[in-house]
Amino acid sequence: MPLFSLRPAATLWPPVLLGSQFVFNIGFYAVVPFLALFLRDDMLLSGGLIGLILGLRTFSQQGMFIIGGTLADRYGAKAIILAGCVVRVAGYLLLACATSLWPIILGACLTGVGGALFSPSIEALLARTGTHSQANGKRSRAEWFALFAVCGELGAVIGPVAGGLLSGIGFRHIALAGAGIFLLALLVLFFCLPADGHTTTTRRRVPWWTPLRQPRFVAFILAYSSWLLSYNQLYLALPVEIQRSGGREQDLAPLFMLA
């Protein structure tokens, strides 16, 4: 594949997906961990409102994955990935410019919706290319997903460091930097992802609630939901604890690296 072309790629290069996950997590973890501090210190919101906004942001992403996956099946993964990048850029720009409550809520929700669009689509592409790789006797699909997870965790480590370095000049600049990261990702993915039209196969579709009839799958959902419930407390609890213990805003970055 040429290093640069003005036309979208004809074939999918799997490392593009790994790099996307790495960059997406940098753009996410450079911004979102510092959102609670911005809402508390700059916008002077109460703890209840901060928790509500963070909860809406989380639901807008994790709670909407099924919609993002459905749209990817219908319109193609590439289109939905690019749309997700656009939506997240819009959310970050709104957070950077907002001066009142409702634009902040909208911006936070848009950042979540963006993730709900591109995350399932990228994983679907990885599953497809991993299956093809395994069928050709190359790297297995499980190995590709393991590398995908490693790249995501690396981004989750570097992101808070990047946000911490920018925290001295204010959250709005952090949000603008996050928007820039996703705008760059949008441009790169436009050229590096092959065209992917909507699904035209005649395979039988089943209702989305069908997997809920499987007890093991329901148990997995409940276990993962419990993990999300506990993990997302960090976005609110860590800033509060740092303030209580007399720490600085920059101290948040290494704590999220460890988390």
Question: Which positions does each model-derived feature cover?
Answer:
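Helix-breaking motifs and short loop linkers at transmembrane-helix boundaries and internal kinks
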Residues: L44, G76, C97-W102
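C-terminal membrane-cytosol helix-exit motif in multi-pass small-molecule transporters
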Residues: G180-H198
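Structural signature of the two symmetry-related core transmembrane helices
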Residues: A79-L94
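Cytoplasmic helix-loop-helix junction between adjacent transmembrane helices
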Residues: G107-G152
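Paired small-residue
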Residues: S20, G91, W102-L110
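Residue-level signature of mid-helix packing/kink "hotspots" within the transmembrane helices
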Residues: T58-I66, A156-V157
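Helix-loop boundary and gating motifs at the non-cytosolic
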Residues: P8-T58, V218-A253, M257
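Juxtamembrane intracellular "pre-TM" segments in multi-pass secondary transporters
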Residues: M1-T11, P194-L222
